[in-house]
């Protein structure tokens, strides 16, 4: 499972913490994907909602992955569950046009 937390970006908004949990205590910066209620229906989005601790249906925007200072991260809002991890991997792959099939 991955944490969804309140993060100071363009404004305070929910974001999915992408940095691996085991390294968080060692880092000053971490990588996040912002969560937005603007749903475009594109392959670089991951659907999230009340099940994940959010107030309404939203998406993880993998086109807008960014790095923030640890101090920008606030309270935990919810979680991205293990069964959503494949969708996250596909969305990140699509956002960066990674060809994972050629290995």
Locate predicted features.
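Loop/turn positions that initiate beta-strands
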Residues: 1-4, 62
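Compact nucleic-acid interaction/catalytic patches
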Residues: 6, 10-50
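C-terminal terminal-subdomain/extension
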Residues: 52-103
């Amino acid at each position: 499972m991955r944490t969804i937390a309140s993060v100071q970006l363009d404004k305070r908004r929910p974001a999915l913490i992408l940095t691996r949990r085991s390294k968080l205590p060692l880092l000053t910066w971490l990588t996040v994907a912002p969560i937005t209620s603007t749903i475009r229906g594109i392959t670089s989005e991951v659907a999230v909602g009340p099940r994940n601790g959010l107030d309404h249906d939203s998406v993880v925007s993998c086109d807008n992955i960014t790095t923030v200072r640890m101090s920008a991260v606030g309270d935990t809002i919810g979680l991205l569950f293990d069964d959503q991890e494949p969708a996250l991997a596909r969305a990140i792959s699509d956002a960066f046009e990674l060809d994972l099939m050629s290995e």
